């Protein structure tokens, strides 16, 4: 685990890094824009690539999905493809030459992901989605709403404990 919490102070203005209220309700560009953390996936993926090269790994994985494309620019297919190309150039000659970025859910909805995870026995009670933080999911933020809907659409029981 790499502690990058200090970077959040530099990326102020987001509900995820600052004292800005997390919007409630469903995902919509007008209310979820405040949850954008500029360049967050590029930052985390750059660190992951550095670690992968140091460990001689052949894969860096990320879990961006189709539902994030319209709100978060660094979750779009064009970003993922360009980032992989950039990193291949950045680490050329170091580590495993087959190192690549793996984004298996890039074109999948949350419901499709939940269905796949259900079939694989993913311990969903141990996963986290809520933007509010805390001990339990709030059930009101966009990610909690999408989580509940994804389980319902996938026909998979939702083991999540919600506050409300």
Predicted regions and their residues:
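ATP-dependent adenylation/nucleotidyltransferase module used to activate substrates
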Residues: 1-121
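Local cysteine-cluster metal-coordination motifs and their immediate loop/turn environment
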Residues: 46, 126-149
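Short, intrinsically disordered/low-complexity patches at protein termini
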Residues: 95-96, 149, 161-163
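Short cysteine/histidine-rich metal-coordination sites, predominantly Zn2+-binding motifs
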Residues: 133-134, 155-164
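Short cysteine/histidine-rich zinc-coordinating motifs and their immediately flanking basic loops
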Residues: 142, 150-159
């Amino acid at each position: 685990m790499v502690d990058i919490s200090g970077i959040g102070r530099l990326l102020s203005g987001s509900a995820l890094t600052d004292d800005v209220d997390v919007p409630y309700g469903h995902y919509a560009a007008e209310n979820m824009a405040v949850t954008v953390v500029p360049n967050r996936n590029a930052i985390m993926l750059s660190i992951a690539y550095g670690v992968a090269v140091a460990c001689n790994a052949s894969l860096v994985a990320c879990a961006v999905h189709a539902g994030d494309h319209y709100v978060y620019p660094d979750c779009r297919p064009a970003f993922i493809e360009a980032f992989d190309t950039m990193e291949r150039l950045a680490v050329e000659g170091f580590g495993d030459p087959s190192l690549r970025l793996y984004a298996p859910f890039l074109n999948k909805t949350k419901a499709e992901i939940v269905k796949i995870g259900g079939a694989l026995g993913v311990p969903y009670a141990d996963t986290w989605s809520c933007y509010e933080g805390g001990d339990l999911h709030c059930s009101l933020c966009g990610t909690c709403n999408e989580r509940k809907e994804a389980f319902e659409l996938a026909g998979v029981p939702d083991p999540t404990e919600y506050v409300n």
